[in-house]
Amino acid sequence: MIYPQTMLTVADNTGARKIMCIRVLGGNRKYAKIGDTIIGVVKEAIPNMPIKRSDIVRAIVVRTSKTIRRPDGMYIRFDDNAAVIVNLDNNPRGTRVFGPVAREIRDKNFSKIVSLAPEVL
């Protein structure tokens, strides 16, 4: 569960390393789960890259430390909270995605993120 003020690692090559969630999009929602869209501010970035520190970005949550239950009864959780930075059309701004992503991303029709990911769990 990603609340406002939660720090997330960035799972792509846009230049941002860490972002802090400042808003969960979609109604009056308190927290975000895998596949949800958030607004974040870049807290740590690589120099000489397109995304700088203190930029406001839109991101899709791809991994959470909180255990999620799938309809078939299986439980899954990850070691970290991670997101992929996207543009307003929900296409990733980077050209690579690092680490595994959850299958729920495919179910929410973020097929471009799934195609860039090395592993879908």
UniProtKB/Swiss-Prot annotation:
Keyword ATP-binding among UniProt keywords: no
Which SUPFAM superfamilies does this UniProt record tie to the protein? Ribosomal protein L14 (SSF50193)
The listed locations are: Plastid, Chloroplast
Major location, coarse class?
Answer: plastid
Asked if the record carries the keyword Disulfide bond, the reply is no
Q: Name one GO molecular function term.
A: large ribosomal subunit rRNA binding
InterPro entries per record:
Ribosomal_uL14 (IPR000218), Ribosomal_uL14_bac-type (IPR005745), Ribosomal_uL14_CS (IPR019972), Ribosomal_uL14_sf (IPR036853)
For this UniProt record, give its keywords in alphabetical order, as a comma-separated list.
Answer: Chloroplast, Plastid, Ribonucleoprotein, Ribosomal protein, RNA-binding, rRNA-binding
Q: What is the stated purpose of this protein? A: Binds to 23S rRNA.
Q: What family is this protein classified in?
A: Belongs to the universal ribosomal protein uL14 family.
Q: How does it assemble?
A: Part of the 50S ribosomal subunit.
The identity of this protein, by name, is Large ribosomal subunit protein uL14c
